[in-house]
Amino acid sequence: MKEEKKLLLREVEEKITASQGFILLRYLGFTAAHSRSFRNNLSGVSAEFEVLKKKIFFKALESSGVEMDPEDSEGHLGVVFAYGDPVSAAKQVLDFNKQHNDSLVFLAGRIDNASLSGKEVEAVAKLPSMKELRQQVVGLIAAPMSQVVGIMNSVLSGVISCVDQKAEKTQE
């Protein structure tokens, strides 16, 4: 193996081990402007997109001890390495896809040491993010509290109203 390929292989191995997960993509009709825009979107969620040769990527997977066989690895192969939350990276891919006529196809992925098919990665991307889930939980907890506060306010205003009416009657 040439020295350049060995260096690239080591670099990809390091990215695989350093990342929280990765997403294998096939890209279609991807221009340089699309690539730049996509990379900028991913940098916001601590992820990066790389175009890699299949042979190099699968060798790096093998030497990193990761077993993965994407259903269909035909075409150009792109990999999103997620150094932060891999679900957020998958969501970015999904959002980008909606804006650019499905130019990216999910082939496979690895999130939290679990290998996923392309369909599974896409399903995970459609789930609410941790931030959204936290907001929903806070909303569920806060809603009954606000109802209790509303009931207490109405009871107190009823008591105050009764006292006011009693005071008016005694003044007459």
From Swiss-Prot:
Record has Ribonucleoprotein as a keyword: yes
One Pfam short name: Ribosomal_L10
Keyword terms of this UniProt record: Ribonucleoprotein, Ribosomal protein, RNA-binding, rRNA-binding
Cellular component aspect of the GO annotation: large ribosomal subunit
Biological process annotations from GO: translation
Alphabetized PROSITE patterns for the sequence: RIBOSOMAL_L10 (PS01109)
GO molecular function: large ribosomal subunit rRNA binding; structural constituent of ribosome
InterPro entries reported for this sequence: Ribosomal_uL10, Ribosomal_uL10-like_sf, Ribosomal_uL10_bac, Ribosomal_uL10_bac_type, Ribosomal_uL10_CS_bac
Keyword field contains RNA-binding: yes
Highest taxon in the source lineage: Bacteria
Disulfides per UniProt: none
SUPFAM superfamilies per UniProt: Ribosomal protein L10-like (SSF160369)
Protein role: Forms part of the ribosomal stalk, playing a central role in the interaction of the ribosome with GTP-bound translation factors.
PANTHER family: 39S RIBOSOMAL PROTEIN L10, MITOCHONDRIAL
Subunit description: Part of the ribosomal stalk of the 50S ribosomal subunit. The N-terminus interacts with L11 and the large rRNA to form the base of the stalk. The C-terminus forms an elongated spine to which L12 dimers bind in a sequential fashion forming a multimeric L10(L12)X complex.
Protein family: Belongs to the universal ribosomal protein uL10 family.
Protein name as catalogued: Large ribosomal subunit protein uL10
